[in-house]
Amino acid sequence: NLIQFGNMIQCANKGSRPSLDYADYGCYCGWGGSGTPVDELDRCCQTHDNCYEQAGKKGCFPKLTLYSWKCTGNAPTCNSKPGCKRFVCACDAAAAKCFAKAPYKKENYNIDTKKRCK
């Protein structure tokens, strides 16, 4: 679920940036998404959005699905059995790892999405 995703982000980035910093970034980080991603980090969010969309098509509810995971050496790893829990966990873990690698550009936080995300 979204709280677990926030915790995964903290695991992957070693707590260097609050999870909420990603909630309103670029065109895809946060609710919804459209247009061309503004940078590598925004592409991570677009991929995560697409993963959640695939989960929804499988009958899962990714924002609410509770799964089992652990933080091992700054890498989130999923422990859930196959099915919705494992699928959603994999979406979140991949995104958290992607966020940790991508540069965070303050100028892409809280942008005017109506102008920049066409």
UniProtKB/Swiss-Prot annotation:
* Alphabetized InterPro entries for the sequence: PLipase_A2 (IPR001211), PLipase_A2_Asp_AS (IPR033112), PLipase_A2_dom (IPR016090), PLipase_A2_dom_sf (IPR036444), PLipase_A2_His_AS (IPR033113)
Q: Where in the cell is it found?
A: Secreted
Q: Where is the active site?
A: 48, 92
Q: Which cysteines are joined by disulfide bonds?
A: 11-71, 27-117, 29-45, 44-98, 51-91, 60-84, 78-89
Q: According to the UniProt entry, what is the EC number of this protein?
A: 3.1.1.4
Q: How is the cofactor bound?
A: Binds 1 Ca(2+) ion.
Cross-referenced SUPFAM superfamilies: Phospholipase A2, PLA2 (SSF48619)
- Give me the reactions it catalyses: a 1,2-diacyl-sn-glycero-3-phosphocholine + H2O = a 1-acyl-sn-glycero-3-phosphocholine + a fatty acid + H(+)
**Which UniProt keyword terms apply here?**
Calcium, Disulfide bond, Hydrolase, Lipid degradation, Lipid metabolism, Metal-binding, Secreted
Claim: Hydrolase is one of the keywords in the record = yes
Task: State the tissue distribution.
Answer: Expressed by the venom gland.
Q: Per UniProt, where does Ca(2+) bind? A: 28, 30, 32, 49
- PROSITE patterns in the cross-refs: PA2_ASP, PA2_HIS
The record's family statement is:
Belongs to the phospholipase A2 family. Group I subfamily. D49 sub-subfamily.
Job of this protein: PLA2 catalyzes the calcium-dependent hydrolysis of the 2-acyl groups in 3-sn-phosphoglycerides.
- According to UniProt, the name of this protein is Basic phospholipase A2 PA-12C
Q: Which organism is it from?
A: Pseudechis australis (Mulga snake)
